[in-house]
Amino acid sequence: MSKQLIYSGKAKDIYTTEDENLIISTYKDQATAFNGVKKEQIAGKGVLNNQISSFIFEKLNAAGVATHFVEKLSDTEQLNKKVKIIPLEVVLRNYTAGSFSKRFGVDEGIALETPIVEFYYKNDDLDDPFINDEHVKFLQIADDQQIAYLKEETRRINELLKVWFAEIGLKLIDFKLEFGFDKDGKIILADEFSPDNCRLWDADGNHMDKDVFRRGLGELTDVYEIVWEKLQELK
């Protein structure tokens, strides 16, 4: 399958394929935090992220969630549907943590009575600012119907993920999703789902996600390997 690099990101390289509606996503060993301010090459990270994300997306597909995932091609590659990415990071929070705790001056780990969905404008120059529905419409990113769908679909995905992670003894604190328009103009889940873009805590409150790298709490791949081993118990 011939391929040409069309985009190089912090965590993945994206390549064309012979089918104009399909792309290959290649996962890198690079770890970044604070919008790329902190970065490091960590051997084995790309393989683990691809394994975890492929596994989660396969389960989401089977549960009826429309995603860009087609198949895992190799240790670091997966075949995806080509989408036009919506420039929003859709964050869902089940518990207080991270920037939410800092913004509102509250402790981490407080259960939210109703999960909170937040939007962040994907713009590196602006440092991905926190925005609301009215900003989304002003920027012509999405209309009312599309905004409602993004929130509803994110909440539906959350209900699935919470159950799966609870089954393996992990608490889903929060996560970030990205969506895009497929060739038919339908909004589908894109990007990835791995400990890079979610927070997972074990029963003792230990971080099982990229906060290990952000906060210098230990070896990133050791933690990701534990998450991957636990996920395989769901098979």
Swiss-Prot record:
CDD domains: SAICAR_synt_PurC. It catalyses: 5-amino-1-(5-phospho-D-ribosyl)imidazole-4-carboxylate + L-aspartate + ATP = (2S)-2-[5-amino-1-(5-phospho-beta-D-ribosyl)imidazole-4-carboxamido]succinate + ADP + phosphate + 2 H(+). PROSITE patterns: SAICAR_SYNTHETASE_1 (PS01057), SAICAR_SYNTHETASE_2 (PS01058). Its EC number is 6.3.2.6. InterPro entries: SAICAR_synt/ADE2_N, SAICAR_synt_PurC, SAICAR_synth, SAICAR_synthetase, SAICAR_synthetase_CS. The keyword ATP-binding applies. Keywords: ATP-binding, Ligase, Nucleotide-binding, Purine biosynthesis. It comes from the Bacteria. Disulfide bonds: none annotated. It is an enzyme of class 6 (ligase). Coiled coil: none annotated. Gene3D superfamilies: ATP-grasp fold, B domain, Phosphorylase Kinase, domain 1. Pathway: Purine metabolism; IMP biosynthesis via de novo pathway; 5-amino-1-(5-phospho-D-ribosyl)imidazole-4-carboxamide from 5-amino-1-(5-phospho-D-ribosyl)imidazole-4-carboxylate: step 1/2. One of its GO terms (biological process) is cobalamin biosynthetic process. Pfam families: SAICAR_synt. GO terms for molecular function: ATP binding; phosphoribosylaminoimidazolesuccinocarboxamide synthase activity. Belongs to the SAICAR synthetase family. This is Phosphoribosylaminoimidazole-succinocarboxamide synthase. It comes from Streptococcus pneumoniae (strain Hungary19A-6). The lineage of its organism: Bacteria, Bacillati, Bacillota, Bacilli, Lactobacillales.
